[in-house]
Amino acid sequence: MKVLIIGSGAREHAMAWAVARSSKVSTVFVAPGNGGTATMGGKVRNTPVKATDIDALLELVAKESIGLTVVGPEQPLEAGIVNRFREAGFKVVGPTAEAAQLETSKVFAKEFMKRHGIPTAGYEVFRDYASAKAFLETCPTFPQVIKASGLCAGKGVVVAMSRDEALEAIHEFFESRIFGDAADEVVIEAFLSGQEASVFALTDGQNYQLFLSAQDHKRIGEGDTGKNTGGMGAYAPAPLVTPEVMRRVEEEVIRPTLAGMRADGYAYTGFLYVGLMIDKGVPSVVEYNARLGDPETQVVLPMLKSDLFDALLASVEGGLEVVPFEMQEGAAATVVMASAGYPDAYETGKVITIDPTVNDMEGVLVFHAGTRRDGDALVTSGGRVLSVTACAGSLKEALDRVYRAVDAIEFEGAYCRRDIGAKAL
């Protein structure tokens, strides 16, 4: 079968790599893909169609007789790509625009959790500056967490440690409009203490299969300092998510979420990412995402021993509960190599040199994000450039392998965090 992966990041490179391993897959199209998917060869090829150009994607699927489409990023989900593909009779992995509101509207998600008794922080919703300001001026405790309701590429959250910081944040959201329409509604919620981890499921709306848990590193600086990013590294499994914690997550979060979505008339299909805060073994939901995370995908997919394609197809056709879904023993880690200046302004077009020894390093995979081909050269084209992954028998060994590979890759101004996974060692 021919498969289409929509997106251009390291997440989509990892998906293309995983799907191409299946003997049942003949060709993997990546739209638009990146410099890494362009040079994978074998079954994988890029096609120059934007991830948000739904009409052109529908044309591509019809023309190439593509049997299954997998949506990587959130923007096409919000735009209703799954609805359009289903109306046209095409098989697609992902939630409808209505179901994807679990990610695309923080207000929808919080109200959904409250309605269905899913553990999450207490919250208030505001639709204008004056009411949010009045609330914060009388708010007795800080920190408070301030979130733009809409999509902000993972950057629309401020943990305000003081009243002044909180007031500044809502001014930026409502008055300076730094996130535009995405901050027309703002959620202010209680700060949850604990450690964050993520759990990922693939679901047909009723049945589900679980990937390994993971922890990512959102901040740009070591020691989790500085600005939020799309994610600077990750590892799996997360030691924090013990079998007992995972049992609670299934019982208190995943099953009630799927049942609640069915009850509300928005059966949820595709990937479900649950961002959790875990405090003394008790999980609370920080956020939902309607797709796999980036960089977490780059650690959870390499740890999947079974055929990903079989599971993806079953999530659309049925039979997901009986599909093999086995994980490897050991651990995986990924480190993001970013452009100088990221997450603020950065330059692109820097030549990337990957030492040939990297190809022979045991357990190492280099997934591309902000890269493109420029003639024979590979050059940078984004803030997050590469996601260097390694699998091994232990997290320590995986991290050793990753950093060995990172040290064999060069581009001007390359930056990475050197403490990925340190708190789990």
Curated annotation (Swiss-Prot):
Residues 110-317 form the ATP-grasp domain. Keywords: ATP-binding, Ligase, Magnesium, Manganese, Metal-binding, Nucleotide-binding, Purine biosynthesis. One of its GO terms (molecular function) is ATP binding. Its cofactor is Mg(2+); Mn(2+). Gene3D superfamilies: 3.40.50.20, ATP-grasp fold, A domain, ATP-grasp fold, B domain, Phosphoribosylglycinamide synthetase, C-terminal domain. ATP binds at residues 137-198. InterPro entries: ATP-grasp, ATP_grasp_subdomain_1, PreATP-grasp_dom_sf, PRibGlycinamid_synth_ATP-grasp, PRibGlycinamide_synth, PRibGlycinamide_synth_C-dom, PRibGlycinamide_synth_C_sf, PRibGlycinamide_synth_CS. Binds 1 Mg(2+) or Mn(2+) ion per subunit. It is an enzyme of class 6 (ligase). One of its GO terms (biological process) is purine nucleobase biosynthetic process. Pathway: Purine metabolism; IMP biosynthesis via de novo pathway; N(1)-(5-phospho-D-ribosyl)glycinamide from 5-phospho-alpha-D-ribose 1-diphosphate: step 2/2. It comes from the Bacteria. SUPFAM superfamilies: Glutathione synthetase ATP-binding domain-like, PreATP-grasp domain, Rudiment single hybrid motif. It catalyses: 5-phospho-beta-D-ribosylamine + glycine + ATP = N(1)-(5-phospho-beta-D-ribosyl)glycinamide + ADP + phosphate + H(+). Its EC number is 6.3.4.13. Belongs to the GARS family. PANTHER family: PHOSPHORIBOSYLAMINE--GLYCINE LIGASE (PTHR43472), PHOSPHORIBOSYLAMINE--GLYCINE LIGASE, CHLOROPLASTIC (PTHR43472:SF1). This is Phosphoribosylamine--glycine ligase. It comes from Chlorobaculum tepidum (strain ATCC 49652 / DSM 12025 / NBRC 103806 / TLS). The gene is purD.
